[in-house]
């Protein structure tokens, strides 16, 4: 942690096909072993499949899926005295996107379809319709925060 100045966030270049920074970030999260072109191919194939099945615009379905997976609150552990409390805190906008994308990718990896593109497309379509593992994960996080609302005054 620097003492003098706050370090700014690195600017991410928008993806080449749709010119979206959010999609570029998603490709980076999906990428394994630095194979960006493979990750891009998977994402673009998944987006095409989604657009075909839903009849909507590529980015519209992607945005809708992300919106339904973004968490509003989460719990953080806070030690007070001898015990640890799960304190509900609001999630910052950048972290909301990061968590939503990470959960979508994790949920897609656990699915049973043949290719990763098919898994990703199916998970995002489910998320756009408010179902699927990624949405369930968000609901679980919200439920945890709701259950621990009594400890909200321990926020820092």
From Swiss-Prot:
GO terms (BP aspect): ribosomal small subunit assembly; translation
Molecular function via GO: mRNA binding; rRNA binding; structural constituent of ribosome; tRNA binding
UniProt-listed SUPFAM superfamilies: Ribosomal protein S7
GO cellular component: cytosolic small ribosomal subunit; ribosome
Domain of life: Bacteria
Keyword Ribonucleoprotein: yes
Alphabetized UniProt keyword annotations: Ribonucleoprotein, Ribosomal protein, RNA-binding, rRNA-binding, tRNA-binding
Pfam families: Ribosomal_S7
Family (UniProt): Belongs to the universal ribosomal protein uS7 family.
Function of the molecule: One of the primary rRNA binding proteins, it binds directly to 16S rRNA where it nucleates assembly of the head domain of the 30S subunit. Is located at the subunit interface close to the decoding center, probably blocks exit of the E-site tRNA.
Alphabetized NCBIfam families for the sequence: rpsG_bact
PANTHER family in alphabetical order: RIBOSOMAL PROTEIN S7 (PTHR11205)
Subunit structure: Part of the 30S ribosomal subunit. Contacts proteins S9 and S11.
The protein, known as: Small ribosomal subunit protein uS7
Organism of provenance: Vibrio cholerae serotype O1 (strain ATCC 39315 / El Tor Inaba N16961)
Lineage: Bacteria, Pseudomonadati, Pseudomonadota, Gammaproteobacteria, Vibrionales
